[in-house]
């Protein structure tokens, strides 16, 4: 308790931590908790199981409590940033709602960006809820630009999400990343008119007074939201005219200038550079902290930690809510209506509730992105940016929004790019460094070569069911086609997985497959061997963990594996990411991951706490054709086996190339073993039993000690001489001069 209290953690939280047998903070907690309590943005990286969740949960809970306590007692914070509310008093481009390389002139109307590689955007200070309105934009040079309208939820990259409507100089209209031909190209000296008829739900544009016709019909999900003038530039300059000056091409058909819009139609921007007065009132659906997790299991795990840490906090009590898919939204909404302080959720359901206004982000004090590299790899960067844009940068008590990003590695380019975009001078806490394999992990590769191992020909139909990628191909023996070898690889991998389990008499292992259908097929094959979910204690008892399984089933399966009811957990990378599973002796990679960092994440699940672990990777020597769904339904009901470049949903997967990238990343050569999967024991390990601690006694260090012995003896003699000299100088002051 004292150790956490010394970092400034309040006694109530320290007491809860002590009851969890956390006597001392872990390294990541000791570094991060004081930084977060001090008000800074923090980027942290540490291994799974290092206490990373506690490192952000503890300070977040404490500051949320202190904020609520201050509100309860009527205290008001003092803003640390000069107010910018004056910009809302007229129609102009908003200096508090723009990209980092977007410049705005002193009049608020002339805008430019000289960035040649990236787009940078901006929105106006005001938007509209009703009426028929118009503004003009003049192009001052030949750079690239898009102009139009967007809601406050939209990305500043206009037209790349479902909340913005753009018209670009290349003659394309854009909405939700769909770029369609529209009107004409425009460039320097052209004037573009932007029309908005909210009552009819129409958006259109004109060029030099020529009406280009209807561009967009406003979809239902944003009909009740204010639309703001917006633009995005790449090495371009524009000048806006909202009606304060005479229009070059005055609008017709009842459209009026934005500057003439009645006050009842106008909505001011949330981005003012300071907290809004309206945010100070209590809103039940406006949490103080938002924690985003990439999977349901991680979200549940984090929520449980929050509940444990805050159990002794009272007056006011903290209210938390889990927002994940697969659960009735009705239940979550009823909790929101009663008030919530901390929300933990996954992107899909969070996006639904935020976009419909059911979850209000106006009072968020903390934004935590856990496993940020996982969130980005799943394609949630637009969601993160859109959500961040909706959160005021200064809260109602005058404090700055704090952003905390946790990642398995901070060396990812995408994570670095995200941090530059949404964080304010973050402190990097990197206790992981470059990826490496712990010395308690023995990892080997088993080459799967269908040309030398012809077992697949002799199995007939008694093999694992494959993923139907080759359902329309000739894969019969003798075809000698890439498709035949690919199908043979899939069959052999099922056999090798069974062989590895039998050879090493595995009693517990995590088995990683590339796709959900691969997981299901391997589970079915284990059931053919007599195992499966309902065969407790059987050699092939197993459960599955992936996104298509129902939430309660996933939770139940994970618990059964942890308790030892079943021996094997068959899962995908996404489902298993960050899950707290300790002491597993074996990992089998049925397919290598397409991201080299994930290889380290996978095999790092064995060999913890000085226990030896074995990771076996089945690596195809030939290319394998696999699913790679780019369709809108993400693979559900998809049978398009054409290659991605031909408009299909498959790719050729080159595991030998992936293996070389992993070896280069780890700066080592991974040992290869024969298809019989007999793994030779490394000489420094002695006799190894995977899952048990390495034999103590220091035998591994004997040679090292022998080498250092002479140096240590010399150091001891020097220490003795120094101590003797000190005693003579301190207590026998005349001794020094007796020799003279």
UniProtKB/Swiss-Prot annotation:
Residue ranges of the region described as Necessary for interaction with HNRNPK: 1-295, 525-740
Location of this chain's protein in the cell: Nucleus; Cytoplasm; Cytoplasmic granule; Cytoplasm, Cytosol
InterPro entries assigned: B30.2/SPRY, B30.2/SPRY_sf, ConA-like_dom_sf, DEAD/DEAH_box_helicase_dom, Helicase_ATP-bd, Helicase_C-like, P-loop_NTPase, RNA_helicase_DEAD_Q_motif
Known EC number: 3.6.4.13
Region (Necessary for interaction with RELA): 1-525
SMART domains cross-referenced by the UniProt entry: DEXDc, HELICc, SPRY
Cross-link (Glycyl lysine isopeptide (Lys-Gly) (interchain with G-Cter in SUMO2)): 281
Keywords in alphabetical order: Acetylation, Activator, Antiviral defense, ATP-binding, Cytoplasm, DNA-binding, Exonuclease, Helicase, Hydrolase, Immunity, Innate immunity, Isopeptide bond, Mitochondrion, mRNA processing, Nuclease, Nucleotide-binding, Nucleus, Phosphoprotein, RNA-binding, Transcription, Transcription regulation, tRNA processing, Ubl conjugation
Domain notes for this protein: The helicase domain is involved in the stimulation of RELA transcriptional activity.
Assembly and interaction partners: Found in a multi-helicase-TICAM1 complex at least composed of DHX36, DDX1, DDX21 and TICAM1; this complex exists in resting cells with or without poly(I:C) RNA ligand stimulation. Interacts with DHX36. Interacts (via B30.2/SPRY domain) with DDX21 (via N-terminus); this interaction serves as bridges to TICAM1. Interacts with FAM98A (via N- and C-terminus). Interacts with PHF5A (via C-terminus). Interacts with MBNL1. Interacts with CSTF2. Interacts with HNRNPK. Interacts with ATM. Interacts with RELA (via C-terminus). Component of the tRNA-splicing ligase complex. Interacts with PQBP1.
Protein name: ATP-dependent RNA helicase DDX1
Organism: Rattus norvegicus (Rat)
């Amino acid at each position: 308790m004292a150790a956490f209290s010394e970092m400034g953690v309040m006694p109530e939280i320290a007491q809860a931590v002590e009851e969890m047998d956390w006597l001392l903070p872990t390294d990541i907690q000791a570094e991060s908790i004081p930084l977060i309590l001090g008000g800074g943005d923090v980027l942290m990286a540490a291994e799974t199981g290092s206490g990373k969740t506690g490192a952000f949960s503890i300070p977040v809970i404490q500051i949320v409590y202190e904020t609520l306590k201050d509100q309860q007692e009527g205290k008001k914070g003092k803003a640390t940033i000069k107010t910018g509310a004056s910009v809302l008093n007229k129609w102009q481009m908003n200096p508090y709602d723009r990209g980092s390389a977007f410049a705005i002139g002193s009049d608020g109307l002339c805008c430019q960006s000289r960035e040649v590689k990236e787009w940078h955007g901006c929105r106006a200070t005001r938007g509209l809820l009703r009426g028929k309105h118009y503004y003009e934009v003049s192009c001052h040079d030949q750079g690239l630009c898009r102009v139009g309208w967007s809601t406050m939820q939209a990305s500043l990259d206009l037209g790349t999400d479902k909340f913005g409507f753009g018209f670009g100089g290349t003659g394309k209209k854009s909405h939700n990343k769909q770029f369609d031909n529209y009107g004409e190209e425009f460039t320097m000296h052209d004037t573009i008119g932007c029309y908005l008829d909210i009552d009819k739900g129409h958006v259109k544009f004109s060029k030099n007074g020529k009406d280009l016709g209807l561009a967009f019909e406003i979809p239902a999900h944003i009909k009740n939201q204010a639309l703001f003038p917006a633009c995005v530039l790449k090495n371009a300059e524009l000048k806006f005219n909202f009606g304060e000056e005479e229009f070059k091409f005055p609008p017709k058909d009842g459209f009026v200038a934005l500057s003439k819009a009645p006050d009842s139609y106008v909505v001011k921007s949330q981005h003012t550079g300071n907290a809004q007065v309206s945010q100070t009132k209590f809103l039940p659906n406006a949490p103080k902290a938002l924690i985003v997790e990439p999977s349901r299991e991680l979200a549940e795990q984090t929520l449980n930690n929050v509940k444990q840490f805050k159990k002794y906090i009272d007056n006011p009590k903290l209210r938390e809510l889990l927002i994940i898919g697969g659960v009735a939204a009705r239940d979550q909404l009823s909790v929101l209506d009663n008030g919530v302080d901390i929300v933990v959720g996954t992107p899909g359901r969070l996006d639904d509730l935020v976009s419909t206004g059911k979850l209000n982000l106006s009072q968020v004090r903390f934004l935590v992105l856990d496993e940020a590299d996982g969130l980005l790899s799943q394609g949630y960067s637009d969601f993160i940016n859109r959500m961040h844009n909706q959160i005021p940068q200064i809260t109602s008590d005058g404090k700055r929004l704090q952003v905390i990003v946790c990642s398995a590695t901070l060396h990812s380019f995408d994570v670095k790019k995200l941090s530059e975009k949404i964080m304010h001078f973050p402190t990097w806490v990197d206790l992981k460094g470059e990826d490496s394999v712990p010395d308690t992990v023995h990892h080997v590769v088993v080459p799967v070569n269908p040309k030398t191992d012809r077992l697949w020909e002799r199995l007939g139909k008694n093999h694992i069911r494959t993923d139907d990628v080759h359902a329309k191909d000739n894969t019969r023996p003798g075809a000698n086609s890439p498709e035949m070898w690919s199908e043979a690889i899939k069959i052999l991998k099922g056999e090798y997985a069974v062989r590895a389990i039998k050879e090493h008499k595995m009693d517990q292992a995590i088995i990683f497959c590339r796709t959900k259908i691969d997981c299901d097929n391997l589970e079915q094959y284990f059931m053919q061997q007599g195992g499966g979910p309902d065969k407790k204690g059987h050699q092939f008892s197993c459960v599955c963990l992936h996104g298509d399984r129902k939430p309660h089933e996933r939770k139940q399966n994970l618990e059964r594996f942890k308790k030892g009811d079943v021996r094997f957990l068959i899962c995908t990378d996404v489902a298993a990411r960050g899950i707290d599973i300790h002491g597993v002796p074996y990992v089998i990679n049925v397919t290598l991951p397409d991201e080299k960092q994930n290889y380290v994440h996978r095999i790092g699940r064995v060999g913890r706490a000085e226990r030896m672990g074995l990771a076996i990777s089945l690596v195809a020597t030939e290319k394998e054709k696999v699913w790679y769904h780019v369709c809108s339904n993400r693979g559900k009901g998809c049978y398009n086996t054409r290659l991605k470049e031909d408009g299909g949903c498959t790719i050729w997967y080159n595991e030998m190339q992936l293996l070389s990238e992993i070896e280069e990343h780890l700066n080592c050569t991974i040992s290869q073993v024969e298809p019989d999967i007999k793994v030779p024991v490394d000489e420094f390990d002695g006799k190894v039993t995977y899952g048990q601690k390495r034999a103590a006694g220091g035998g591994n260090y004997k040679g090292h000690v022998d080498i250092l012995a002479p140096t240590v003896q010399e150091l001891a003699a020097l220490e003795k001489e120094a101590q003797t000299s000190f005693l003579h100088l301190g207590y026998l002051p005349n001794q020094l001069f007796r020799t003279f």
